[in-house]
Amino acid sequence: MNDANPTLDLQGAPLSRRAWLELVAGAGGAALAAGPMSALAQGAPKRGGVLKVSGTANPSSLDPATGGAGSDHTYLWTMYDTLVEWDYAALKPIPGMASWAYPDPKTMVLTIKPGITFHDGTPCDAQAVKFNLDRGRTEQRSNIKADLSSIASVDVTGPLQVKVTLARPDSALPAILSDRAGMMVSPTAAKALGNEHDRKPVGAGPWKFVSWADNQKLVVSRYDKYWRTDRGFLDGIEFSIITELATGLRSVVAGQNDMAYGLPPRLKPIIDKAKDLNLVTGPTLYCLQIYINLAKKHLDNVKVRQAINFALDRESFVKVALSGMGEVATMQLPKSHWAYEPALANLYPHDPAKARALLQEAGLGSGFELTVGNYTDQDSVRRGEIIQEQLGKVGIKLNFIRGSIPEISGQFFGNEKKFDLLISAWTGRPDPAMTYGLMYGKDAYFNAGRVEVSPELQQLLQESRASENLEVRKQVFSKLQRIVMEQALVAPLAFTLEFNAIHKKVQGYKPNLLGKPKYEFLSMT
């Protein structure tokens, strides 16, 4: 199904093409200025109701340890609680299923809250936490090994207490345990199901898994024995997988879904004009970027990678691809972030002449071709076309292979190594050490070429997690970011804003800096 269809029918009432075009035309003169972060009204939440959501991508996996797509999180959070959580305003770690303490810099003690059970009825106790942390560190299929690389051993010291012995101090570990590494799966289910747990997940979150039809629908329902009473109000959530974002918004306008998230700014006027919809916006760490496989021919030359960065017109990209509503990305942290390094902001001005000179020095003055992974939705295709035009002006021809997010991402980061470049995004993490560790650690999943750039970079990755003092850490990140950008290990493009269209009958939504919806506090009137 695509935008050319005369009607949209996702098991509900159709919205005629004429009605849709009237909405578009009526919104044509609407202001496109993005507002400040906003949240939906917080009335007294009512229990009940099934929330229907337009999901942006098919999950790569429903096992937190084996998945690899940033778009998975919004599904995973329904079925899994995390040992540590983050506050919505600043992503600061706060206790979740467990609290933590550091008796000394190389020891973390986790104290698990009582009464937590998995969806199969088994207890989420110290043994379960040890199983999960060891699984994440050692399982062959785990994609979170880099997150847990500081852990030397995990020991059960009480029914609800675990001692984590560290190989080196790690101040980022609480934030790490608020992400995939802190999502606890049932040991009983994981052992019994093996690889099938990817599709039949058993967690301890507010909702339990019901069904998943690839590229169609994911359904979860309330877990009646959920350990908290102040959240998880919905009876269930149904995700319709609609990768074309404009089509997803149509489904909400037509009343077939209650919510569409991750929308492009170009659709804001339609949301503003539509009846009974709220627009929720907010800043994010979501960085559109070009991933580079450093092991590929030509891209193993720093001059070629630098040429790509000089060839990019980021200001134009934000204007055209994001309707002017975004922030130019000169590194992988936005200007408002505490670890942002302003000295690097002008490292790669738009300079096609410089790009061509670097390619000439690299022996590629007559031009060359690269294969690029790209997604099939309209906005991804448009972003690819913009980049294709910009790089083409300096003699770099891009040949695209397109597919779904899980398919293309897996082919780039997994064993196939199918493309030279990937136009995608880094969706952000609660702590910047996670971002840089997951992308540039020698064996990290998102280091597509599995290349060790330099011993200094690897040392800085460890140092970035060694201190709790933000000023000390900022100095480390300054050095780390300088290596990343001077070596042109990535080509950042822009930071996006969160744009969600939510029906007015839905209450309690809170934006977050990751720009990914969590549903724990949502209720329906």
Spans of features found by a protein language model:
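N-terminal secretory signal peptides
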Residues: 1-19, 26-33
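N-terminal lobe/hinge region of extracytoplasmic solute-binding protein
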Residues: 54-105, 134, 200-202
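Gly/Pro-rich hinge or "lid" segments in bacterial periplasmic/extracellular proteins
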Residues: 87-89, 178-232, 236, 353, ...
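Surface-exposed binding/hinge segments that line
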Residues: 111, 146-189, 211
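Ligand-site clamp/hinge motif
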Residues: 224-270, 397
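Extracytoplasmic/peripheral linker and loop segments enriched in polar/acidic and small residues
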Residues: 303, 379, 397-410, 435-504, ...
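Structural transition elements
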Residues: 327-361, 379-382
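Long beta-strand-rich cores associated with HINT superfamily self-processing modules
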Residues: 500-525
